[in-house]
C-alpha cells in the first residue's frame, strides 16, 4: 500500500469555499424564477430571507427553501455562521418540459408545455467577517 505525503498541502480555507444547494424539477417557468433571483443575488442571507418572505411572487417559496438549505449546508458541513453568509451566485436552468394535449373542437388537440426549472444557490462567508 502506497501512502501519499500530504503534509505540505494546506487545508482549504473556509472563507473561500462556496456551499451550494440545488432544487431540481421545480414546476415553474425559469423566466418567472429569474425575476426573483435577480433581486437577491449578492445580498446577505438574512436580507435575502426578508425579501423573499414579502415578495408577492409564487417563485419565492422554492427559492426561499433552496436558500435556507444552502445556509444549513454551510453551517453543518463547514461550521459557518448563518449571520455571516452572503449569496454569491444564484442560477436558474431549464429543466425537463412536460408535454400535454388539450382537447379542442373537431377532434383536434393543442399542445401544452409545462416547464420546470433547476434552482442552484451558492453561499459563502462574507469577506469582511474573515479577519478575526
Curated annotation (Swiss-Prot):
Species classification: Eukaryota, Viridiplantae, Streptophyta, Zygnematophyceae, Zygnematophycidae
Protein family (similarity comment): Belongs to the universal ribosomal protein uL22 family.
Record carries keyword Plastid: yes
Keyword annotations from UniProtKB, A to Z: Chloroplast, Plastid, Ribonucleoprotein, Ribosomal protein, RNA-binding, rRNA-binding
Keyword GTP-binding belongs to the record: no
GO MF term list: rRNA binding; structural constituent of ribosome
Function in brief: This protein binds specifically to 23S rRNA. The globular domain of the protein is located near the polypeptide exit tunnel on the outside of the subunit, while an extended beta-hairpin is found that lines the wall of the exit tunnel in the center of the 70S ribosome.
Coiled coil: none
Pfam family, one: Ribosomal_L22
One GO term of the biological process aspect: translation
Record InterPro entries: Ribosomal_uL22, Ribosomal_uL22_bac/chlpt-type, Ribosomal_uL22_bac/org-type, Ribosomal_uL22_sf
Assembly mode: Part of the 50S ribosomal subunit.
Gene3D superfamilies on file: Ribosomal protein L22/L17 (3.90.470.10)
UniProt-listed CDD domains: Ribosomal_L22 (cd00336)
Protein name: Large ribosomal subunit protein uL22c
GO cellular component term of the entry, any: large ribosomal subunit
Primary localization: plastid
